[in-house]
Curated annotation (Swiss-Prot):
The protein, known as: dCTP deaminase
Listed GO MF terms: dCTP deaminase activity; nucleotide binding
Assembly behavior: Homotrimer.
Binding site for dCTP: K111, S112, T113, Y114, A115, R116, T135, L136, E137, Q156, Y170, Q180
UniProt similarity note: Belongs to the dCTP deaminase family.
Record flagged with keyword Hydrolase: yes
Pathway as given in its UniProt record: Pyrimidine metabolism; dUMP biosynthesis; dUMP from dCTP (dUTP route): step 1/2
Keyword terms: Hydrolase, Nucleotide metabolism, Nucleotide-binding
GO BP, sorted A to Z: dUMP biosynthetic process; dUTP biosynthetic process; nucleobase-containing small molecule interconversion
Lineage start: Bacteria, Pseudomonadati, Pseudomonadota, Betaproteobacteria, Rhodocyclales
EC number: 3.5.4.13
Enzymatic reactions: dCTP + H2O + H(+) = dUTP + NH4(+)
Length: 188
């Protein structure tokens, strides 16, 4: 597997709609203000967080169970910023919609700007032929409230292309998160 360059990312976005909306350059400023960067970088694409958030709360005193997740464990927020309580987390989604080619697997890593503040961004790989909005998980590891920004960069996607096409893609096996839109909770 080889990592793909900015030229490849631009070509795949333009010719195959791999990322929509797409920024062909790295954007570091908006309306004269510095922002957490997003867009195409040398060997990746910095994704943005949308304005939809689900902030975890324990008001119902439930047990967190990935096989039987209680959606009432979240407070839904639509805003340009989201405050995550201390030692808690929030779910969000990307502004970008992805269509991953059959020969490609991605790895997504949180941006150091957030990591240096104790905010960890977790995203699983995007598998071959998966498509949808990416559900993001922001963990606030600090004892203080933490702020995240919609419309700004939050993580970087790295694209790896195999020298051999996979036998069965995510789409072929009917992956449960195929075509997801909005913030998607756990499914079994």
């Amino acid at each position: 597997m080889t990592i793909k360059s900015d030229k490849w990312i631009r070509r795949m976005a333009a010719e195959h709609g791999m990322i929509e909306p797409f920024s062909p350059e790295l954007v570091r400023e908006a309306n004269g203000q510095k922002i957490v960067s997003y867009g195409t970088s040398s060997y990746g694409y910095d994704i943005r967080c949308a304005r939809e958030f689900k902030v975890f709360t324990n008001i119902n005193s439930t047990v967190v169970d990935p096989k039987n997740f209680d959606p009432k464990s979240f407070v839904e927020i639509e805003s340009d910023v989201c405050i995550i309580p201390p030692n808690s987390f929030a779910l969000a989604r990307t502004m970008e919609y992805f269509r991953i080619p059959r020969s490609v697997l991605t790895v997504c890593l949180g941006k150091s700007t957030y990591a240096r503040c104790g905010i960890i961004v977790n995203v699983t790989p995007f598998e071959p032929e998966w498509e949808g909005h990416v559900t993001l998980e922001f963990s606030n590891t600090t004892p203080l409230p933490a702020k995240i920004y919609a419309g700004e960069g939050c993580a970087q996607v790295l694209f790896f292309e195999s020298d051999e096409i996979c036998e069965t893609s995510y789409k072929d096996r009917g992956g449960k998160y195929q075509g997801q839109e909005g913030v998607t909770l756990p499914k079994i």
